[in-house]
Amino acid sequence: VLSYLFKRLEERFDGQPTLLILDEAWVFLDDPAFAGRIREWLKTLRKRNVSVIFATQSLADIQRSTIAPAIIESCPSRIFLPNPQAVEPQLREIYEGFGLNARQIQLIARAEPKREYYYQSRLGNRVFELGLGPVTLAFAGASSPQHQKTMNAFTGVIDPADFALVWLRHA
């Protein structure tokens, strides 16, 4: 089944700009077949105009992976979420493994949750905010189970063309 899935995905990598988003990346990293293919993709997909995005709530998931060196080397641009525990010895060591120094780890530890993020790349590093306004947040921030339940309740009841207006009134 995985071989078929990999084949179907690779058929879609046709040179058009593509994002391969691996959310909850630990699931993929824990599976030897997936991990091996991800390692291969990290080395080859750039030539096919594919960018790979790993999303995980725990950097330890990546650090413990058998392909951690390939991920760290092939993904030089990273966004770190605020983590007050980042300065604790065990976690600090993990952050250092991603090339962060004491000052950068301190910035991550002091960043305001759900507002500030730390960007790391070869071109530079900085704390940033998305600066989303209330309208954008009404859509981009609607990710809770209750939000999903409400959206599902709208399905089939309202005209899809009216969804944005109805959602904004609800939010």
Write out the residue ranges for each language-model feature.
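Conserved P-loop NTPase motor module
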Residues: V1-G15, I79, Q106-A171
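Conserved P-loop NTPase motor cores
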Residues: V1-Q104, P134
